[in-house]
């Protein structure tokens, strides 16, 4: 277990080919990246010591594109953000570039051919991502940048470079509230399992 329990975000393309895995360590309490005293980011192919490995990045979540050909695609920067946002808004596809400048080239964006795509950049990166629209417009059915975060963010939030996942997690979902209750009283999980209880959300 790398660094005592890091997460691996696998990059799998539309054809099901595994390109690599990005290994990152997160703080179990805050959910934030551990960046001190070192970045705590590395790659599976590096850890496996594969010689002459030719890394060709693809979007995180790209393997879902052919499974849901009619769904709108939301593109974010962080792999973690894509995973979290998919919990809150499962009716669209969430994929990640893996970095502010990652995966924005003609080869990788070909995976988005014919799709309706919405870019949701981190705070402070909106202008840079808007500059990607002409390139995306050549292959996507439609491409736009959603700047709702910039419109609603405070100066402090902008200085922190928050992303959509940070805003989504500011309010607990019923599932999150239940998990906190289970953490405080693990016997509750046994009761839920034995009675086959389900969360019922109000319409």
Give each language-model segment a name.
Residues 31, 70-71, 80-203:
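TOPRIM fold recognition
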Residues 2-113:
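Phosphate-handling DNA/RNA-contact segment within nucleic-acid enzymes
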């Amino acid at each position: 277990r790398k660094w005592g329990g890091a997460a691996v975000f696998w990059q799998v393309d539309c054809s099901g080919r595994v390109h690599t895995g990005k290994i990152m360590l997160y703080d179990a309490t805050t959910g934030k990246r551990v960046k001190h005293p070192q970045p705590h980011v590395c790659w599976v192919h590096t850890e496996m010591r594969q010689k002459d490995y030719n890394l060709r990045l693809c979007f995180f979540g790209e393997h879902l594109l052919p499974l849901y050909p009619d769904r709108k695609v939301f593109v974010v920067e962080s792999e973690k953000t894509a995973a979290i946002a998919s919990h809150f808004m499962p009716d669209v596809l969430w994929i990640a570039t893996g970095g502010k400048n990652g995966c924005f080239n003609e080869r990788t964006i070909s995976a988005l051919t014919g799709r309706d795509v919405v870019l949701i950049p981190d705070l402070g990166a909106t202008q840079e991502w808007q500059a990607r629209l002409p390139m995306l417009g050549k292959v996507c059915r439609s491409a736009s940048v959603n700047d709702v975060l910039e419109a609603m963010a405070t100066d402090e939030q902008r200085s922190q470079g928050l992303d959509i996942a940070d805003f989504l997690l500011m309010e607990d979902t019923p599932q999150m509230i239940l998990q906190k209750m289970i953490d405080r009283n693990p016997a509750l999980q046994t009761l839920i399992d034995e009675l086959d209880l389900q969360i019922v959300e109000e319409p």
